């Protein structure tokens, strides 16, 4: 093998190493940026949900409207499950959200296994306000799961206390 061939092979190998390193670094950077963007989006949706929930709930209570079959759908606890289902009609980026419970009155609001695990985690870590982790469902599809507790406050028990009082 001539010196010229050896130099070209060495340069080719060096170029391959540099390109591989650049690809690996770029991939890690892009993955981190995508994760940061997904976390930002999750926090934005959460903030909007909580602000909407608080304003509508307060408005409903202050309005003096009776809570009955005709008006209960206006309360966030009832409307948010419908809003979360309709959200996909307006946004195709894969974000889904819901409000769930480990003891729901409405079976449609039952927490899944990942959400139940998050609830147990928040009970063990009550000072934490959010949690993000990667999960893989039973179909092998991966997601970024953002969870944040909605703690029960005294005014919540007006509707969410004893069934006979609701």
Describe the predicted segments one by one:
Residues 1-28:
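Extreme N-terminal signal-anchor transmembrane helix of membrane signaling/transducer proteins, especially
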Residues 48-54, 58-153:
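Extracytoplasmic ligand-binding sensor domains of the Cache superfamily
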Residues 6, 34-37, 150-152:
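Long, amphipathic alpha-helical coupling/dimerization segments that relay conformational signals between
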Residues 150-166:
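The canonical Cys-X-X-Cys-His
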Residues 25-50:
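Juxtamembrane membrane-water interface segments immediately C-terminal to a transmembrane helix
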């Amino acid at each position: 093998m001539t010196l010229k061939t050896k130099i070209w092979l060495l340069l080719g190998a060096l170029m391959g190493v540099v390109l591989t390193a650049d690809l690996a670094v770029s991939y890690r950077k892009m993955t981190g940026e995508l994760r940061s963007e997904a976390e930002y989006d999750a926090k934005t949706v959460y903030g909007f949900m909580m602000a909407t929930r608080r304003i509508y709930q307060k408005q409903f209570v202050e309005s003096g409207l009776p809570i009955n079959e005709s008006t209960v759908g206006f309360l966030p606890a009832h409307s948010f499950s419908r809003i979360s289902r309709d959200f996909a009609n307006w946004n195709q980026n894969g974000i889904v959200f819901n409000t769930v419970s480990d003891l729901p009155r409405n079976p449609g609001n039952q927490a899944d296994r990942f959400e139940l695990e998050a609830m147990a985690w928040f009970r063990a870590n009550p000072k934490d306000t959010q949690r993000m982790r990667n999960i893989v469902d039973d179909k092998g599809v991966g997601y970024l799961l953002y969870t944040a507790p909605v703690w029960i406050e005294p005014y919540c028990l007006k509707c969410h206390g004893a069934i006979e009082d609701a």
